[in-house]
């Protein structure tokens, strides 16, 4: 980015990357070194500005230091718990001519220990708890994906018979069609995984932060459980929930060790309890969404998308109702196919992120699923899509509201709608102005054909699906509630 406003515009993206453990290397321009501190044109102290939102940053004022800084930046960003780094380079350093820089090896940085040694006493203690458990439960987070441990998680679950639920960022790390998979956990997660959090006797959290979207009211969270927490970042262990056994390690190494120490076992009745609870959700929520009487629903749009892509597309979601619906109804079959803004909840994320996913995985189908509110926050990126002919498919679920905020205003604030209703442009004409083929679908009998047309397009394509204005997303955890307090329908009026 350029100096000044170009650099400060990176802050939200860096914050998003930091909390979601995304490796990013940002290079910013800066004024001449002799002008630093003089409030020169487009001078901002970007290094101090970005300290809270980066894993590491540095300012380079001499050309000889550029190569070591770049090598160190890429190493730090991608190792350990990944995260964003920033290099700020002054104008004079950019203008200097230097000889070919030498290769810089950065695998030994003083005080930086990206991969902790596995402590076998902790593994043995965890295995003892697991072997004695009657109702064990695995919560699988993004750390599984970051360590490449999906296969190890599958082997561990199959050997021990332990049910697996995924967090928002963990989706895709475990096959959704596996009998041990019990669903998506959290604020708008499936009924079974949420309710049974307070029924398990051993809870195994792997590569997750136990943040508020996963726990709800932490004082009442998993009260019957003895908790095992596996994470590469020591700062996350016991930060929110009290951990009985902490395994500070790479998830893949920890799971490999646990597979060796844990005894073969099955828990059919325990897994069946998840199925029964999820059936209650189906009867009250999913059945209604898949058998609608009037407008298209978000659930049926995403279900059709999942079926047509066989769960194999890279799906990039924005933030809001559509994000939660996609997490519940899209059957992510493969690791690293679910891309979303989980911790920061950054509206406008999906369109630029989908562009990056498409460029990074050119052999994969990439679909950006976006609400009409978030879409307009970065809609200018249609110009980039047009310029570089990026074949991303854009699916906007249009309910003419900032739907998630409206849902809370409706359910808990007596429909006092404030700044949530949208006045939208003609999205089809807007896409066409960028020379992107576009279509709008409102009728149920045209939905499948419209989605197929979008997916079959050789280049970029825009599809607007008009859904019910006041459709709500259930299950949901009410404010102040624990995840086990999850609601399947609007709360009764007092």
Language-model region placement:
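N-terminal alpha/beta PP-like core and its mobile active-site loop of ThDP/TPP-dependent enzymes
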Residues: 1-266, 304, 308-311, 391-394, ...
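Generic enzyme active-site microenvironment
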Residues: 86, 229, 316, 369-370
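Thiamine diphosphate
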Residues: 27, 35, 41-42, 237-240, ...
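Active-site diphosphate/adenylate-binding microenvironment
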Residues: 277-352, 357-358
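Conserved short loop/turn motifs at secondary-structure junctions
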Residues: 141-145, 291, 371-373
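Structural motif
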Residues: 202, 314, 365-367
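Short beta-strand segments
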Residues: 88, 316-318, 464
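Flexible, glycine/charged-enriched surface loops at secondary-structure junctions
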Residues: 82-85, 265-278, 462
